[in-house]
Amino acid sequence: MVQSLHEFLEENINYLKENGLYNEIDTIEGANGPEIKINGKSYINLSSNNYLGLATNEDLKSAAKAAIDTHGVGAGAVRTINGTLDLHDELEETLAKFKGTEAAIAYQSGFNCNMAAISAVMNKNDAILSDELNHASIIDGCRLSKAKIIRVNHSDMDDLRAKAKEAVESGQYNKVMYITDGVFSMDGDVAKLPEIVEIAEEFGLLTYVDDAHGSGVMGKGAGTVKHFGLQDKIDFQIGTLSKAIGVVGGYVAGTKELIDWLKAQSRPFLFSTSLAPGDTKAITEAVKKLMDSTELHDKLWDNAQYLKNGLSKLGYDTGESETPITPVIIGDEKTTQEFSKRLKDEGVYVKSIVFPTVPRGTGRVRNMPTAAHTKDMLDEAIAAYEKVGKEMKLI
């Protein structure tokens, strides 16, 4: 007798709940800003990816409303039929200038970018070297390509060199690509791009950087690749338009030749309706803001350093983060989840992150300070960390 859908779901949902792996989803009442409201109660929000506070920016809201008035609420078709609006062309030209590349292509999400770009270029005759802590969308994009996937120890340049040498010298593959996050989302560490480029040039590797958490944050806002001055050395620059940019979507930036190929061959571009007009115009406005001023970028880093210093002085382990991402590493999964709940009771919303998202025994709460937080908010959060940490005997 085959298993019914109900039996499958009941068994596996119960397993998740019994093992502390079931994710309870909270509904936010209103905007996702530095303060949020859930079930009528206000919280200091340290869980969003809204790094620069642009998700609630008045100029972006005005731009979106104006675009809806002139272009409607939807694009009406896929890009290759008649869903490419002048707004999309303007956005992609702006993104290319922002990233220092010849061209760019916009997608409906950052996840779509990795599903699209990897499988459009790599196939069963190729090999992909992938950092072991890369985002789930990279993992899925690699699987979709059917290329040989070779896991590389996290930011281990000796391991990368050895595996690149082995893959290239084996003669089994037409192309070999190395893929890495620019900024790793769980720990906040930065990819060693100068060393990666050196190894890539030595062995002829294609280079692919997913800068979801670096765009708007690193390189005075232009990203991790710009931070290291390597715009002409990285073949694929990937980014989201939903984190620091504050809206929705993703993009690939690179040579005109690459972008032409993606427009012809990447399936999410070919078979999914393009970004909505309001979103598209708001994104363009956000990118132009970052090109015109570093004010929000600088405020983000100032707030991040303030929070890190406060948590470190209390005795918390904030890991090796080199970016505003600020983990507080607790260790035990159940203790981590209890810690997050107790902080919520004190008015601080910061989610627990445990196995399998991070290795077992490295549970943490991940703080995401933004440019929109005030020092008073951060002081209140630090005070809550002190109170709960002492009550739970963690500090």
From Swiss-Prot:
Family designation: Belongs to the class-II pyridoxal-phosphate-dependent aminotransferase family.
GO molecular function: pyridoxal phosphate binding; transferase activity
Pfam families: Aminotran_1_2 (PF00155)
Residues binding pyridoxal 5'-phosphate: 110-111, 185, 210-213, 240-243
Cofactor(s) this protein requires: pyridoxal 5'-phosphate
PANTHER family in the cross-refs: CLASS II AMINOTRANSFERASE/8-AMINO-7-OXONONANOATE SYNTHASE, LD36009P
Record: residues binding substrate: 135, 357
Annotated CDD domains: KBL_like (cd06454)
Protein name: Putative pyridoxal phosphate-dependent acyltransferase
Signal peptide: none
Assembly, per entry: Homodimer.
GO BP term, example: biosynthetic process
Enzyme nomenclature, EC number: 2.3.1.-
SUPFAM superfamilies linked to this entry: PLP-dependent transferases
Enzyme superclass (EC): transferase
